[in-house]
Amino acid sequence: MKQFIDFIPLILFFIVYKLEPRIVELAGHSFTFGGIFSATAVLILASLLVYGTLFLIQRRLEKGQWITLLACLVFGGMTLTFQSETFLKWKAPVVNWLFALGFAASHFIGDRPLIQRILGHAVSLPAPLWTRLNLAWVAFFVFSGCANLFVAFTFHEFWVDFKVFGSLGMTVLFLVGQGVFLARHMHEHSTESAAKSKD
């Protein structure tokens, strides 16, 4: 569920991006609404609202959420300041690669891989499987970052569509794959444990 909360600002960004730019008057001021720059402003405001609400409810944000929020503020802010969408195109690759770096670094920092620290309270697996699972997340984030970068700078007309639906689709497929992997190995692990207890 937490992964999909991150997509709320992105979906609002997509909706505004697809609007035909038009002049809107508000409180005596007129401005253009629709297109990439209006969508970027909505992305920033929606991110602040979503993560601000989560912070008030939970009294904290996870590190990944802080990274996503800060990246949105930095890259979105530069996009609006310099009126160039190039900065925003780098946001998804950089965020994904930072996540990949965090998962990879956990093999050398701390006593457990990062995915085990996240899921270890609910799932029991042998250490080698936790390592494989963690490396799968590293590979996913590296691939996702590269895919976003390639599409953003190769297919200009479709990069926003891919940013929303491509990223969401890849995430859903990967999570389903992870669920199948966990279910299969949890069953094997519980069967082995039961057999050992009988011995």
From Swiss-Prot:
One Pfam family this sequence matches: IspA
Intracellular or extracellular location(s): Cell inner membrane
InterPro entries (UniProt xref): YciB (IPR006008)
Membrane topology of the entry: Multi-pass membrane protein
Domain of life according to the entry: Bacteria
Entry keywords, A to Z: Cell inner membrane, Cell membrane, Membrane, Transmembrane, Transmembrane helix
Keyword check for rRNA-binding: no
Annotated GO CC locations: plasma membrane
Membrane spanning stretches: 4-24, 36-56, 64-84, 90-110, 135-155, 162-182
Alphabetical list of HAMAP family matching this protein: YciB
Role description: Plays a role in cell envelope biogenesis, maintenance of cell envelope integrity and membrane homeostasis.
Family: Belongs to the YciB family.
Protein name (database record): Inner membrane-spanning protein YciB
